Amino acid sequence: DPAILQGFNDLILQQNIPAVVAAMEISSPINYVGNINARKAPVYFSNNWDDDLFKPNSILDMFSQLTGPKHLDLLAGIHMSAEISGLLGLPGLPWDNVHSWFDYWLKGINNGFMSQPAVTMAVKHTSDTTTFASWPSSTVATKTFYLGPRAFNPSGKGTLNNSANLVSFTDAILSGLDTLATSGQVPVIAQLLEPVVPITVSMSAISVVNGIVYQSGALSSGIKLRGIPKLNIWITPSLAQAELVVYLYDVDSTGTGTLITHGPVSLHSATPGKTIQLSMELTATAWDVPAGHRLAIAIDTYDPLYSVPTLSLYTVGFPLSAGKQSVLTVQYVN
């Protein structure tokens, strides 16, 4: 399709973006939820946690808006990796469920599929699954961590705290070089292998010049993350264009962080030197952080998975004070 090719080229060259978005809106199924609901059409979703083409966040959003019969499986892997077994003639959960779905809705076979919970989430790096009767779910709670400044902390890290920050300080990072915080050194390959080869980093090795880390204390009871982590953060970019990539880590007693999820945000028309508040989502996840481990976020300005909005050097300040609270919120189950 020439229109799709033109849109792809425009994205690469960062031009005609409003026109690209408008063109893509036409083919986005979330814009037809009203029609689907009016027909009460049954909808089955299968999606993977690290799918960078169809993020689970958007799937969860659409799923939550549907009012008719629906089912969602969120599995480990990247785009199509959980489904590829069926293409090879091998068994797999998505294909088994698709057959059961069609048997029920097209053949009228009462196979009990619709009596199952509507949402199944594979817990990353385990063989466990979590089920929910619906999404959003009343069984999912939210926990807030308040960012505390790095300032002159001997550890070189900021903090994630249970109570509001009362210290006034502005930390800053410089663009131009990547840090060891990454979604994977080799895009696609790293994400493909991630279910069996976790992406890890020594948290103390993340550059304090080009990145910043905020870390919690040891968690006394652990936490079972289920859903979408969100970061509301105050920043001061020195240029109109900038990029931030936020990584969420499970940090063990040795200081090694295992990547849980991440999320990027690009600025294209900021006012240089003006402090703004960013609200961003990280990619949805299901992850069990053991007791005694810590949660941490690392922030830098580059990741090999994403193009950058500018090649010029810039700084990003992170002002914190009693009047400017930056917070990380995570969804979890007991």
Predicted region positions:
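Short beta-strand/loop motif that positions the catalytic acidic residue
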Residues: 39, 44-47
